[in-house]
Design a protein with these regions (language model features):
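Charged DNA-binding/catalytic regions of mobile-element recombinases
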Residues: 1-156
Length: 156
């Protein structure tokens, strides 16, 4: 869990847009933290950060785009508390956060597109199920056709 990346995307809940924040371990592409909420805020990012199971002191770097949800006092204080260095993409360069962008392409294709979430609670429940499936069952070509959890177990 040395380097983690994150981003946000939107998902339809009822008739409104809600947001999902994912934290991905760059080493094995495992989704290690997530949150869902009605607003695209620093609190949503913070909720995803505190959902990470494991020692946050093991994280050396946190990379994101330059969105205000990531670059603010709340997140800065949390990162400082655990000695995590922040890395921000260059302005106007989404390729700097390519792993997170690719993750959300997969997420939208496999999870969000065509899904009907009538409540935020239903979204959160199905998001937890998806994360479990993604980490423990779904194989990844970049990981030698192992799941993220299998890859971590075999290499550490």
């Amino acid at each position: 869990m040395a380097v983690i990346v994150s981003d946000l995307t939107y998902v339809r809940v009822g008739t409104k847009w809600h947001y999902v924040c994912l934290f991905v371990d760059l080493f094995n592409r495992e989704i290690i933290g997530c949150s869902a909420g009605a607003n695209k805020t620093a609190e949503l990012v913070y909720q995803a950060l505190v959902s990470i199971r494991g020692n946050l002191n093991d994280i050396q770097m946190f990379h994101t785009d330059r969105g205000k949800e990531f670059d603010n006092k709340l997140i800065s204080k949390a990162l400082e508390t655990f000695g995590i260095q922040r890395s921000l993409s260059m302005k106007g360069c989404p390729y700097d956060n390519a792993v997170a962008e690719a993750m959300f392409k997969v997420f939208k294709t496999e999870f969000a597109n065509g899904a009907h979430f009538f409540t935020l609670e239903k979204l959160a429940l199905e998001l937890d199920d998806y994360v479990h499936w993604f980490n423990n069952i779904r194989i990844h070509g970049t990981l030698g056709y192992l799941t993220p959890v299998e890859f971590k177990q075999q290499t550490l």
